[in-house]
Amino acid sequence: GSLDDSLGWYNMGINLLNEGKNEEALSSFEKAIGGCPSSEVELRVKAQNGRGNALYNEGRYPESIVAYHTAIGLDPKSVSGRTLFNMGSSYAAVEMFDDAIKCFSQSLERGLDKSEAELCEKQISRCRVLAREQAKRQARSIR
């Protein structure tokens, strides 16, 4: 595989994602990753994020978390606020609220635009409420 091929697959994946064609996008991102030279870390990170987004859109939350973790692991210093926000959303979807709150909080530190930051604050508040309710339910089920 070449960098040009991988870029082509990545761009196709983005277009398919924007059209709501998540399965096709997923396939394109996987082809981009498969053929991408290991030295092209930035493209690999972006393609893993794309995979995460496509998986999230398909309701495949645990798999999306793995994709986001892979992206972060490739280049921890360059992690965007949006990646952390998306991973937080995946954690919230599987009711792992403490992990979601950590991701949302870190995403604020990594830079989000104003509307994203406001949404992030709302998500943190929502997850805190849900985490408390979850803890109460678990405490009741133990008795």
Enumerate the language-model features and the residues they cover.
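Terminal, low-structured helical/coil segments at or just beyond the last alpha-helical repeat
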Residues: Q106-R143
